[in-house]
């Protein structure tokens, strides 16, 4: 029980911080944190909640299938399946899914992936070589959630990672809440920088193709 309260507090603090950045517009987004490994349980945001508010109903505890462990009227977030795929296939401890203007714009510039390179902040992703290059996959935003989940699952390759969904934000996961938040901040910085650079250069260039 102590672990549950500790993780609840941790997830609540992350929600507050990301809310101050307006990364949960119009009740969008969802975040989760692992509570136990065997059996697998995790806390996830309840569906349709105003994330600028803090209430006792912000999160609910679900199992490895995303089904509530305790009787509740709350519904887990619509994209819970993405979280279950991550936790069932990795040792990740935290998953963050947010909608920002920048990450949505990026998915309209590129088709299957965006490639970013030679930025110091890439080291926040535990990539240390000089002039490092990263590739972030982009998948289609299928309305059929099982199809979305299956396409997403194909890109889960480790205990940390990120996947962009076209016009539907980014999902980032990490070893724990600190790692996941650090990675999310790094990706959002890279997207903002890339878009600003393209605007200064006079438009889409360097391999980017308008996908809208």
Swiss-Prot record:
SMART domains in alphabetical order: Aldolase_II
Record flagged with keyword Ligase: no
Known EC number: 4.2.1.109
Residues bound to Zn(2+): 97, 99
InterPro entries listed in its UniProt record: Aldolase_II/adducin_N (IPR001303), Aldolase_II/adducin_N_sf (IPR036409), MethylthioRu-1-P_deHdtase_MtnB (IPR017714)
Catalytic class of the enzyme: lyase
Sorted UniProt keywords: Amino-acid biosynthesis, Lyase, Metal-binding, Methionine biosynthesis, Zinc
GO biological process: L-methionine salvage from methylthioadenosine
Cofactor binding, per record: Binds 1 zinc ion per subunit.
Pathway, per record: Amino-acid biosynthesis; L-methionine biosynthesis via salvage pathway; L-methionine from S-methyl-5-thio-alpha-D-ribose 1-phosphate: step 2/6
The protein's required cofactors: Zn(2+)
Known function: Catalyzes the dehydration of methylthioribulose-1-phosphate (MTRu-1-P) into 2,3-diketo-5-methylthiopentyl-1-phosphate (DK-MTP-1-P).
NCBIfam families found in the cross-reference section: PRK06754.1, salvage_mtnB
Complexes and interactors: Homotetramer.
Protein name: Methylthioribulose-1-phosphate dehydratase
Organism field: Bacillus anthracis
Gene designation per UniProt: mtnB
């Amino acid at each position: 029980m102590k672990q549950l309260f500790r993780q609840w507090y941790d997830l609540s603090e992350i929600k507050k911080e990301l809310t101050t950045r307006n990364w949960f517009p119009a009740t969008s987004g969802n975040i989760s944190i692992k509570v136990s490994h065997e059996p697998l349980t995790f806390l996830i945001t309840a569906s349709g909640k105003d994330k600028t508010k803090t209430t006792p109903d912000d999160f609910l505890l679900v199992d490895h299938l995303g089904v509530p462990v305790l009787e509740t009227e709350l519904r887990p977030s619509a994209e819970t399946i993405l979280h279950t795929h991550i936790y069932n296939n990795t040792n990740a401890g935290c998953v963050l899914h947010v909608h920002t203007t920048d990450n949505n714009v990026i998915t309209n510039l590129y088709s299957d992936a965006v490639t970013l390179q030679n930025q110091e902040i890439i080291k926040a992703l535990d990539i240390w070589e000089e002039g490092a290059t990263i590739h972030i996959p982009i998948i289609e935003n299928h309305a059929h959630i099982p199809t979305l989940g299956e396409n997403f699952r194909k890109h889960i390759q480790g205990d940390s990672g990120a996947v962009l969904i076209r016009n539907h934000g980014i999902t980032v996961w990490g070893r724990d809440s600190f790692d996941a938040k650090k990675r999310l901040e790094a990706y959002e910085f890279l997207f903002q920088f890339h878009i600003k650079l393209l605007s200064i250069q006079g438009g889409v260039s360097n391999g980017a193709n308008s996908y809208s």
